Amino acid sequence: MINKIIAATLVSGTLFSFSQCAYAETPAILVKELPSNQSFTGLTFIPNAQVQNYGSFGFDFAHGLPLRNNVSDIESLTFSLGLIEGLEAQGRIVTEDYSSNGFVVGSIRDLSASFKYQLPFFQDFNKFKLAVGVQDLGGELNYFNTNYIVADYSFDFAPIRMSVGYGQSDIPLGVMDGPFGGVEYQPFNFIQLVGEYDSEEFNSSVKILTPKELLPYDITASLSYQVYSGHGTDTKNVWNAAFSIPLISDYTRSVSFSQNDMSLRDKLFVEQKKFQDASISTLVSALKNEGFVNVQVGLVNGRVVVALENRRYNHNQADGLGVALGIVSSHLGQNAAQDIGAASDQFELVMLANQKPVVSVLSDSNCYQSFVNGSASCDDIQFITRDLPERLDMVDWKTERVNSGTLDSQIVFSPMVRHGVATEYGVYDYSFAMSSNLYTYLWSGAAIDVRHILPLAESDDFEEGGYFEDSVYENEIERAMVHQFFRLPYVDIANQVSLGLVKSDYIGARSESAWFSQSGNHWLGLEMSYFQHQDEKDKNGYANPDRQTFLTRYTFSMPEWDWQFNATAGEFWKGDVGAKFTTSHWFEDIEVSASYQVTKFNDTDEEQFVTVSVKLPLTPWRDMSPRVIQVRGNEAYDFNVTTRVGNDYNYLAAGQGDELVMDNSMLRRYFNRGRYGQEYFEQNRQRIRNAYLRYLGTRLN
C-alpha cells in the first residue's frame, strides 16, 4: 500500500510541476477529450465528464482491459459517435483472439453498447461538467457492465482537468466499483499526461495526439500508453490507438461557406451577370450541359415554369435542387422572360423523378441571386410538395422537352457483405460480393431493375462445411423487376407497384404506398407483397413456403434535429409477426440508426433483437453526367450489426424481422430516402444555396 501511495504522489507531483513550467509558455492550450481503454471518453480505466463532439465518428483499438480479476491481455475495437449534443454512443468488440471457435476454446468474445450523457444544466459554466453513463448496456452476457456519474473541472491557471465520480460495476477486479478520480494535464498540443485512481488502484498514462489541422478533413489521431499501474501489469502492455473525424462540414449549414474563396466569388459574379442578356435557349442549354434531363420551360399566370430532373447529384436531391436554382436565377432575367411572354423574373422550378413531379420551388431571380451571393436575405422562396401533378397540368409549355432521359440507364455498383460480428466462430466472418444494378427508365414512372451479384471473397466459416455456408453469396441474377410509380388523385397518395424476381428465387409482386403531410413531418406507409419460390422443394426435399408481407409504417421527422422515428408493424418476410421501432440520426447524408424489434412465429416465443445500421454514400457528390449509360456508386450503402436481447443466451439467429429491402424502393427513388416535405427543404435552405457554390467550385477545379 505504501508503494502505491508513493507512486501516486510521484505521478501527481510530476503532473503539477510540469504544468507550472509549460503553462507559462502555452497558456492557450485546452485539454483534449480522448478515448480510454474502456468504452467511454476518459483517462485510462475511468471516465471524465467530457463527451465526443456532436457529429464526430471515432475508432480506437485498445490492448489491456480490466476483465474478471485482473487487467487481461485482451483487445477491443470500439466505434463511437457523437449522436446528439451531449450524448456519445459506443459499440465495442472485446476479444482474446480473432478466429478461434468459442465453443471449443472457451475464449471471450463480447459485443456491447455504451452511452454517456453530459447533463445540460451546467452549460453556462464552461469549466465544470457533469455526466452520467452506462457501459455494456443490455445484452445477455455482461462482462463489463458499469453505471457511473462523473464530474470534472478545467482550471484556468494551467491546462489541467480534474475528474471525480462514483460507479457501480460488475467487473470482479473492482474497477469503477466505488469512488474514482483522476487528473489530465496537457502541457503541449501534442502530449497529454494522465493519472487516476480507478476505485481499486492507481494508474498513469502518456497520450500523444496530433495537433489541430495537421491531418486532412479535420481528422485527429492519438496514441496512449500506460506507464504505471497498481494492478501488477509490469509484464503487460496497456495501450490504445484512436482516430476521429467529423461527419458534418460547413457545407450543409454555414452561411459563410466559400466566402473567403476569391476565385469562386469572381466566378459567381460572372455567372450571375449573365441573367441580364441570357435567353431561354441559353438557360435550357446551361441546364442540359450540367446533366439535367427532361428539361422543359413554360408559363403559368405570367410566371416562368422550369421542369427538370436530377440524376447527377445523388447524395441528396436538395443538392440537385440547389444547383438548378442557381443556374435558373443566373439566366432568367428580363430578356429571357420576354422571350416567352413572362411578366417578370418570377419563376417556379419543378423537380422531377422519372418524369414525376416531387417538389416545386417558387422564387424570383433578383431575390435568389442576393441569397446566393450573400448580399441580402431572400424571403421569397417557397417550397411545395402537395398537388404537384395538378400544378403541372396548368402549365402552358413553350419549349419541347430537352435531353429526354427515356430509355437511359444507370449502372450502380455497390459492395455487399453478409457477416457475423463477434460471434463464437470469430470476430468477423464474411462473404463479400459486388453488385451491379441496371436501372433503365421507361415511360413516366416506369423502370426496369436488374441486379447481378458477383462473389469476391469469404472467410472459412462461409465456405463449404462452415457454420455460415448457406449464407454465402453466389454468382447470379438476384433481382429482376419492373416498377411503376403513380399517385392517387385527390388524396395525394404515392404508390409503386413492382413485379418480378427477388432474392434470387422468388417471383411475385410488391406494392408500396405512402402519404406525406404537407410539412413532411409525418408520413404513413403500407407495404403488401406476395412471392412464390421457383422450386417447389429445397435441396433437402422440404417444401419451399410462399412469402408474403403486410407491413404498416409511421415515420415522424424533425429536420431541425436531423432525426426521424419509425414504427413498423405487421407480417415480415419469413412469416413472423410483430413490430420494429427505429430511431435515425442524419449526419449530412450519413444515416445512423438503431432498431429494436420484437416478433414471433406461430409456434414459437417472442424474440427480441437490436440492430445498429449505418447508411452512407459510396459515390461522388457530383456523379458523371447522365447519358445513355451512367455509371455511379451506391448513394445509401447499408452496413448493419444485429444482436439478440431479452434472452438468457445470445445464440445466433437469422431471418426474424426480415424485410424486402430494395435499392430502388419508392422512398429512395422519389422521396430522397425519406428526407422530404416542406419543412425539410425549409430547414435545408442553406445547403440548397451552398450546393450551387460547391458546383461552381467543382467547375473551377
Summary of predicted features, one role per range:
Residues M1-Y23, T583:
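Gram-negative bacterial Sec-dependent N-terminal signal peptides
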Residues L65-N69, D97-N101, F121-Q123, G138-E140, ...:
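Gram-negative outer-membrane beta-barrel proteins
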Residues A24-N142, S154-A158, V206-I208, Y228-V238, ...:
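Transmembrane beta-barrel domains of Gram-negative outer membranes and organellar outer membranes
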Residues S56-P66, L87-D97, K127-G138, A151, ...:
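Transmembrane beta-strand segments that form the barrel wall of outer-membrane beta-barrel proteins
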Residues Q50, I74-G86, I108-D124, L130-V132, ...:
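Feature captures outer-membrane beta-barrel proteins of Gram-negative bacteria and organelles
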Residues E25-P35, T41-G42, A49, F190, ...:
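Flexible, glycine-rich linker and terminal segments associated
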Residues F57-F61, G302-N310:
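Short, aliphatic-rich beta-strand segments
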